[in-house]
């Protein structure tokens, strides 16, 4: 059996990914209820759920940025190998890997955009952080 690292597969799901998706769905559900006005502040138990949501969003943004950094490092190495001399067959494989990594970078940038949008909901408008996040979201939209 070939290991995952050797096959250059980067999107395998594990148990933590499933837990992460479940937490995300639960927080999305509460966000929809809040936006509809169904949930009041008493249910939040002094903003506990809002704090959990804020922590989740921050962790998710950091996770997306970390994945982007790793993918961009690999893409940079592929670009270096393509610039060098080599066999035509190897270059074709590298070009295919580059296309795959470009697609993964687009998907992760879209996920980052969604996570930043969650953060925008939790941060008050007019603050410096809100303005910076707005600029980052605009940049992500341009990339996607």
From Swiss-Prot:
Residue ranges of the TM segments: 18-30, 52-73, 109-131
Key words, A-Z: Membrane, Peroxisome, Peroxisome biogenesis, Transmembrane, Transmembrane helix
GO molecular function: peroxisome-mitochondrion membrane tether activity
Gene Ontology CC annotations of this record: cytoplasm; peroxisomal membrane; peroxisomal-mitochondrial contact site
Subcellular location: Peroxisome membrane
Protein name stated in the entry: Peroxisomal membrane protein PEX34
Gene of this entry: PEX34
Top-level taxon: Eukaryota
The species this protein was found in: Saccharomyces cerevisiae (strain ATCC 204508 / S288c)
Membrane topology label: Multi-pass membrane protein
Its job: In concert with the three peroxisome divisional factors, PEX11, PEX25 and PEX27, controls peroxisome morphology and abundance under conditions of peroxisome proliferation. Maintains mature peroxisomes in actively dividing cells.
Subunit structure: Homooligomer. Interacts with PEX11, PEX25 and PEX27.
GO biological-process terms attached to the record: peroxisome organization
Disulfide bonds: none
């Amino acid at each position: 059996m070939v290991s995952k690292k050797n096959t250059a597969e980067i999107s395998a799901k594990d148990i933590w990914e499933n837990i992460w998706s479940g937490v995300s769905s639960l927080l999305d559900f509460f966000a929809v209820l809040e936006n509809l006005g169904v949930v009041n502040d008493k249910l939040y138990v002094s903003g506990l759920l809002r704090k959990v949501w804020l922590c989740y969003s921050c962790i998710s943004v950091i996770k997306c940025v970390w994945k982007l950094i790793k993918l961009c490092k690999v893409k940079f190495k592929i670009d270096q190998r393509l610039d060098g001399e080599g066999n035509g067959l190897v270059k074709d494989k590298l070009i295919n890997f580059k296309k795959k990594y470009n697609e993964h970078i687009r998907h992760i940038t879209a996920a980052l955009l969604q996570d930043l949008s969650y953060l925008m909901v939790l941060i008050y408008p007019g603050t410096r952080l809100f303005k910076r996040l707005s600029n980052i979201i605009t940049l992500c939209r341009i990339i996607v």
